[in-house]
């Protein structure tokens, strides 16, 4: 059985653009995510 290729191809720029802090701050829902993570005491708020 042939398996497909690995789907995770790391790329720091894309990671930041898709999950980064500036993207989160753009929308109300994104700000809510960051607020919730701050309240919970997460070490990393965003990627």
Curated annotation (Swiss-Prot):
Pfam families from the UniProt entry: Ribosomal_L34
Its BP terms in the Gene Ontology are:
translation
Q: Does the keyword Ribosomal protein apply?
A: yes
Alphabetical UniProt keywords: Ribonucleoprotein, Ribosomal protein
GO cellular component terms, alphabetically, are: ribonucleoprotein complex; ribosome
* Organism superkingdom: Bacteria
- NCBIfam families per record: rpmH_bact (TIGR01030)
Similarity-based family: Belongs to the bacterial ribosomal protein bL34 family.
Q: What is this protein called?
A: Large ribosomal subunit protein bL34
Instruction: Say which species the protein is native to.
Output: Mycobacterium marinum (strain ATCC BAA-535 / M)
């Amino acid at each position: 059985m042939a398996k497909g290729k690995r789907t995770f191809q790391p790329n720091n720029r894309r990671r930041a653009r898709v999950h980064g802090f500036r993207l989160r701050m753009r929308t109300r829902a994104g700000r809510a995510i960051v607020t919730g993570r701050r309240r919970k005491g997460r070490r990393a708020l965003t990627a």
